[in-house]
């Protein structure tokens, strides 16, 4: 079992989606985690609602700082940054990490601020989910 950490700034949307996809669809090979460099302290309510409607279990999922993963209690095999801010920030040296991969994924939370339309909110969530899911699928195909 390999541990995968997804990092973004707020740990409220993109990294939460990625963690959820890993733990839902690839739980036989991977354990997903997420964290933020400046966590918001909560999962974005639109993303939370979207994932729950898709049947994802978010009981153990919460917004947290990446410092929680620097204590070596959990060996992280792969680290992904899923936003430019997290990629460009001074990130810690990850103990025992195998690789760091950067995916520049557009922030759905910024788009949510421009609408109150439930259909648009769902479309934004779905596009973000599909983007992340596709990247994870491609990465797993090449993961040895």
Specify the residue positions occupied by each region the protein language model found.
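Alpha-helix C-terminal capping/helix-to-coil transition sites in glycosyltransferase folds
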Residues: 74-75
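Conserved active-site segments centered on acidic
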Residues: 1-70
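Short glycine-rich anion-binding loops that position phosphate/pyrophosphate groups of nucleotides
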Residues: 10-12, 84-87
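Residues at the C-termini of beta-strands that transition into short coil/loop
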Residues: 36, 83, 104-106
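Phosphate-binding/catalytic loops
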Residues: 88-144
């Amino acid at each position: 079992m390999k541990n995968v950490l997804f990092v973004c700034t707020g740990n409220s949307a993109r990294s939460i989606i990625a963690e959820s996809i890993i733990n839902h669809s690839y739980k036989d090979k991977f354990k997903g985690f997420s964290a933020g460099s400046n966590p918001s302290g909560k999962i974005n309510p639109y993303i939370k609602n979207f994932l729950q409607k898709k049947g994802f279990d978010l009981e153990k999922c919460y917004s947290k700082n990446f410092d929680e993963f620097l204590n070596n209690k959990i060996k992280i095999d792969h680290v992904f940054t899923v936003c430019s801010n997290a990629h460009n920030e001074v990130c810690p040296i990850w103990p025992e990490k195998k690789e760091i991969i950067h995916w520049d994924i557009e922030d759905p939370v910024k788009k949510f601020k421009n609408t109150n339309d439930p259909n648009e909110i769902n479309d934004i969530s779905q596009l973000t989910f599909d983007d992340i899911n596709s990247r994870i699928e491609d990465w797993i195909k090449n993961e040895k």
